[in-house]
């Protein structure tokens, strides 16, 4: 139910959308039994963030350009990614968390798959919802539930996730640690109003409090802004539409794939993010 939403297939579709070809290979894929001819590619992108069995082959002697996509350094720390990059002689780390940038990495923010995640023709029936994993959000989710008509969709994935987010007037989000998680972009990609915890890098991504999302820095602010948006449908819809427009323009897998191809072709502009 979540297969088509995985990063590997989302990036593959996006690369093809940008006019290049892409193949997916790895553990639990149908083609895993036959290792590719790595030298036959222009670029290899390693998306594995949790190689617990050591299945990823050593690419240290492969001369093809190699990128490592670091998505979860905010959870695991940067050392494991740096070690993988060094041992495999990777050319570049695509780093989702800007606090971990080095001279061998670029900021590669999270994004969303606009082919699968989009506004649906349904009326939102829940004032505030949360679709995702609890992790360390238990206490704040309890607070939200105590203050709003709240719908909790625990680990709902795939098409059901898209339907859930579309059913909320407001989608509550709490980033973990330094992360700007996928949920930010997925929510806005559904044209649902995002109410999210503060991150200092939002402005660089074009996410602006009160214009295309709502950002809180305290419980009091969370409740105040949630009630404000619920009490003003026109405001809520306007902010949600602005949010949809900004992520559709700047933060889809298609844009991230273009960045990868621009780097490969030597025409990357850091200001494009």
PLM segments and residue spans:
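A charged, aromatic-enriched C-terminal amphipathic alpha-helix characteristic of glycosyltransferases
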Residues: 231-264
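N-terminal soluble segments of membrane proteins
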Residues: 209, 226-227
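Conserved short-loop catalytic and cofactor-binding motifs
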Residues: 175, 210, 244, 248
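Conserved acidic donor-binding segment of nucleotide-sugar-dependent glycosyltransferases
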Residues: 213-219, 228-233
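Nucleotide-sugar donor-binding catalytic core of glycosyltransferases
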Residues: 1-209, 215, 254, 258, ...
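Generic C-terminal helix-cap and adjacent flexible tail
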Residues: 265-273
